[in-house]
Amino acid sequence: EPMNSNDPAYILYTSGTTGAPKGIVRDVGGHIVALKWSMKNIYNINPGDIWWSASDIGWVVGHSYIVYAPLFHGCTTIIYEGKPVGTPDAGSFWRVISEYNVKSLFTAPTAFRAIKKEDPEGKFFKKYDLSKFEILFLAGERADPDTIKWAENLLKKPVIDHWWQTET
């Protein structure tokens, strides 16, 4: 059945860490427009590019940037089951980026803290060709300066820490 652009898509609740949780209603049309716009204007992803949002699909970033945004923007999305370490090792993210020629990765800082802890020298990183990889985006929680610097030094690419609606 057709929907109006202002029909609710879902309600997103803040964590409540600074008070009672607050519900944010996302409308269908506005959310789709914002997601499509952000793929080009924030993430520099073009139709046909390969994008990876390494998030839980149940979180807002997960369903928004694993499913909806890539679908509406016409790019390839990576759906990954596993953790950044231990599935099978701390090179899992590098293997996926290399194997699928990922242009940009969006993940939580915790993922990179885990990789850094397991492989501080970046030995797994050196095993893979990441020549197509351009930029790392971190969000969802505080990105500590040590983790950002470690990722920048390892990747030799920009590492962007940014915030979203319920984090501000």
Locate each region found by the language model:
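Conserved adenylate-forming
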Residues: P47-G48, G82-T168
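Short functional hotspots where side chains directly engage DNA or cofactors
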Residues: T14, V25
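Conserved pre-ATP/AMP-binding loop-to-beta segment of ANL
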Residues: E1-Y13, A20, L35, N44-I50, ...
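Conserved short alpha-helical elements in the N-terminal third of ANL/AMP-binding
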Residues: G62-I78
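Residue(s) in the substrate-gating loop at a strand-loop-helix junction
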Residues: D56
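Adenylate-forming
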Residues: H31-I32
